[in-house]
From Swiss-Prot:
Keywords of this entry: ADP-ribosylation, Chromosome, Cytoplasm, Cytoskeleton, DNA damage, DNA repair, Glycosyltransferase, NAD, Nucleotidyltransferase, Nucleus, Transferase
Entry's family note: Belongs to the ARTD/PARP family.
Any one Gene Ontology molecular-function term assigned to this protein's record: NAD+-protein-lysine ADP-ribosyltransferase activity
EC annotation from Swiss-Prot or TrEMBL: 2.4.2.-
A single GO cellular-component term on record: centrosome
Gene behind this protein: PARP3
Alphabetical list of SMART domains matching this protein: WGR
Protein's name according to its UniProt entry: Protein mono-ADP-ribosyltransferase PARP3
Domain PARP alpha-helical: 183-301
Organism whose genome encodes this protein: Gallus gallus
GO BP of this protein: double-strand break repair
Impact noted for substituting residue 85 to A: Does not affect activation by nicked DNA, while it prevents activation by a 3'-overhang substrate
Amino acid sequence: MAPKRRAPPASQPADGGKKAKGGQEEEEDAWSSALNALKTAPREKPPATIDGQCPLSAGPDAKVYEDYDCTLNQTNISANNNKFYIIQLIEHGGTYSTWNRWGRVGEVGQSKLLPFTSLEAAKKDFEKKFWEKTKNRWAARDNFVAQPGKYTLIEVQPGAGQEVALRVDGAGDEKVSKRRVLPCALDETTQKLVALIFSSDMFRHAMQAMNIDVKKMPLGKLSKQQIARGFEALEELEAALGEQPRSMSRLEELSSRFYTIVPHNFGRARPPPIDSPELLRAKKDMLLVLADIEVAQSLQAQKVEEEEVVAHPLDRDYALLCCQLTLLEDTSQEYEMILNYVAQTGGQVYVLNVWRVAREGEDKLFQAHDHLEHRRLLWHGTNVAVVAAILKNGLRIMPHSGGRVGKGIYFASENSKSACYVGCTSKRVGLMFLTEVALGKPYCITRDEPTLQQPPNGYDSVQACGRTEPDPAQDVEVTLDGKKVLVCQGKPIPMPAYKDSSFFQSEYLIYQESQCRIRYLVQLHF
């Protein structure tokens, strides 16, 4: 059991959070809403920096001339091509050079630095190389059109770092006045949690685990428009997968396009074609993780008021979540109940900490389902990289058009089932949500129904009945905000009524995002 710890001071959510929407409003699908948000995001002009492999990058007076800087990518599965090309025009000491570096994605590659006697000559060389590699004019790059057999322009945006130093104009010269940072108001354990869910190293590890090349899409430089193009490429792949008979050459072509837009590091291995619904779903989820990482990075990039006394960085990050996290004492009844829930239904996992969660505005959304009486506290596993986005925006309908139980939010009564979807840190630390789900009258199924987008008429949720279920006789009833909620406390036992079910463990599905309320965040070691 975790050592005894003090509870964090009660804190109030920041004012001005997102406005609660009426429960009767139709809720947007995460896929389409994420795509629309990314496509309509303001286009930011990146401040170009010299490629770190360039010998001039360490020079004090060297800089990229204006915006003469581009990263190109090309993937061709049939030819086992997965390569990049960097072109920059560098100004240094009154002279100009072009820098070119190229190679296989994930490797340093080869390079060439060419000095020129004039700016015009350097521009001409840069623009010529861009044309040779892309068959697009540099002057028309804002209307870039990908050409067969050529490189595609990869779009990045400015970094998300915040300055701590405040620049002050003095009399006659400029000086830097350090802001006084207030002590952190969070308890030590919650400080570590906030540091984890906003950690650049954690985001980088999550991206590497998905084979995303972090050199081409460095943290803080993920372009919203670039992610949107990835979404669109997957939509084309989904349509091609639905065609009968399937064309493998077409799937390879579209997969190559996707890998060109979202650079992946496969080493020297041949990039795999996305040729099954399972692989397509994995890439969809990957892009949603990328979008959620961008949400967390954007939260941190919000402008800080220029004050001489500023909140501690962890307090600022915590406030951005618009969510109250209360660390539970390991001697409390709540903690013991959750510890037993994990012990009875989980695998080889160890509970590190548990926080009670109160998301701003979620209680009002959840009230739209007060009439539903059948409620359970159920598990939801996710990647640690998206926890900040979930705490900020809530659980969303995942775009599993080919999922076993359709397009909804998936929960489980067995910790080991939801644990399959947890993405851990490099130290095998993961986070899971315990969520109150208003199930009402569930529609019970024993076979896959992947086309479901809502429960049948007369039902409020869907239960994929598993061949095992935590012993119902051991369920306990707790009261949360005046409502009775069932919590599993027994070991899974065979369910004779569902011995022929295609589901080994039960899953619970809702098709409205407001039909659940996050109650606890559980940190585990796997």
